[in-house]
Regions:
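Conserved alpha-helix/loop element of class I SAM-dependent methyltransferases that forms part
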Residues: 42-88, 98-106
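A short acidic, Gly/Pro-enriched loop at the edge of an enzyme's catalytic core
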Residues: 85, 150-162
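Conserved class I S-adenosyl-L-methionine
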Residues: 86-95, 114
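Conserved SAM/SAH-binding beta-strand->alpha-helix loop
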Residues: 119
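Conserved SAM-binding loop
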Residues: 126-127
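Conserved SAM-binding strand-loop segment of SAM-dependent methyltransferases
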Residues: 135-150
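A short SAM/SAH-binding and catalytic strip from SAM-dependent methyltransferases
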Residues: 160-173
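A short glycine-rich, Lys/Arg-flanked "PGG" loop and its adjoining helix->strand segment in the class I
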Residues: 175-187
């Protein structure tokens, strides 16, 4: 059972992370909780170079809306998830939409890619990018929702796959994140 002290501490962590990412969204610069630092170390000067090193293809990067790649990645979850056409994929901590837009192309018109982020500024950035994505792909299969990964705004047994890129580690209540993931995944 969590005490009021631990709940206050959890909220303080969320507020710190939310504030750091809000600043990044507003500055459109790379970094994690302070400019120039990602959750995996120093942020690169070239976000596309980092993405290529993580296995994103040149074609994937060129197809992204401007500003979606902020150099915050620590991996390539859409590739590792082996997403299939028709699947519903959920991205925890979707930020500017980088992995959601890539996942949306992989699941195609019969699938859906949903991004959840707790930072209104990141969601605004992602939502501004949706028009470009739809124009390029002719797909209407991506959406972004405001919420915390410990309390997902997603129905039970709704998604086929969950991806996340350097975000779960920032949660002060990881067991709750895993419970939420189990709740929203289809059996």
């Amino acid at each position: 059972m969590k005490t009021s002290f631990s709940l206050d501490k959890d909220q303080a962590v969320r507020d710190l992370v939310r504030g750091g990412y809000a600043k990044i969204a507003e500055e459109t610069s790379a970094g994690c909780c302070s400019p120039g630092v990602s959750c995996c170390g120093s942020a690169p000067q070239d976000a596309d170079k980092l993405a290529r090193e993580l296995g994103y293809t040149k074609e994937e990067l060129q197809a992204l809306p401007e500003g979606a790649n902020m150099g915050l990645s620590c991996g390539n979850p859409a590739a590792l998830a082996a997403l299939q056409p028709g699947e519903v994929v959920l991205d925890l901590g979707s930020g500017g939409g980088f992995d959601v837009f890539i996942a949306g192309r992989k699941v195609g018109g019969s699938g859906r890619a949903i991004g959840v982020d707790m930072t209104a500024e990141m969601l605004a950035k992602a939502r501004r990018n949706v028009a470009f994505y739809r124009e390029q792909t002719k797909l209407e299969n991506v959406e972004f929702r405001l919420g915390e990964i410990e309390h997902l705004p997603v129905a039970d047994n709704f998604v086929d796959a969950i991806i996340s890129n350097c975000v779960i580690n920032l949660s002060p209540d990881k067991p709750q994140v895993w419970r939420e993931m189990a709740r929203v995944l289809k059996p």
